[in-house]
Amino acid sequence: MLGRLLQANQHCMLNNFKSPRRVVITGMGCVTPIGIGRKAFWSGLQKGESGVRRIESFDVSRSAVKIAAQVQDFDWEAQLDPKDRKHVPRTVPLALAAAREAFEDAGIAASDLSPEEKQQIGVMLGTGGGGLPFVEQHYAIWYQGGAHHKASVYIIPAATHGTLSSELSMAFGLRGLSHVISTGCTSSTDAIAYAAQHISLGRQEVMLAGGVDAPLAPGILAGFNLLTVLTTQWNDEPHRASRPFTRDRSGMVLGEGSWIYVLEEFERAQQRGAKIYAEIAGYGTTCDAYHR
């Protein structure tokens, strides 16, 4: 029994997708601090732009950390039905916008899909914080103001990371699997890997896969600062703050955004004449089991 378990664990560490079903990327969408959409994002990268700025969404006058990479010039309300705008965390419109662009880029119109086709399309997202800023905001109403009736009844759904994939599934009417992976900084990569595996094993034909996060709130900022992982040296020069490969690096910078791929079974993509960006041939995953 132990031998079989070790063999299974070794397979999980490096999965080369030995199934005859190949997995390819046919669509991409993103919302980032240096551009909305993949073309604007790529242009920002080519120009060497920085998306790090002084935080404006809440008071940072008493915080040692005053900067973050915030999404700019994004129409948050356009992504949601008016009745839903006050009931979902900031991560939901970020994910919706990226998913819409990814579908459009892949040449897939969700509104034209048959019920059978919608059963074959799933969602797999990665997130670290999910809806924590939304939860923090509304718990503050409870604990500080006492006006309980003003707190959202959606605090608990927002606190559940699964809300993110559910919102995408509902928005596009997708009836395939709908999961969220939360493994810290590797969440999005893990989500893409597991989504590809579902296609490789024949469980789904198409997957929306990627990640979204918007961890910008006073409590979260303070928590990361307590870990001493955020830079505090570049508050006056935010564009110089993110410098992981320099000798004078002093910590990371929090940011928000989303990136979502359309993953598709290779032969299906070929048959419909889809453009193919790349193939996912396999993935590796381990744990150092070292420290907190």
Predicted features, each with a name:
Residues I36, F134-H138, I192, A217-G223, ...:
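Short acidic, glycine/serine/threonine-rich loops at helix termini
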Residues A95-I108, H161-L164, S169-F172, S178-D213, ...:
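Active-site-proximal alpha-helical scaffold in enzymes
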Residues L2-I25, D112-K118:
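Flexible, low-complexity linker/loop segments at domain and module junctions
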Residues R203-S250, Y283-R292:
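Acyl-CoA/ACP chain-elongation machinery
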Residues I25, Q46-T183, V212-L221:
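Conserved beta-ketoacyl condensing-enzyme motif
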Residues R22-T26, R53-R54, E237-R292:
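Condensing-enzyme catalytic core mediating Claisen C-C bond formation in acyl metabolism
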Residues G37-E49:
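Short Gly/aromatic-enriched secondary-structure transition segments
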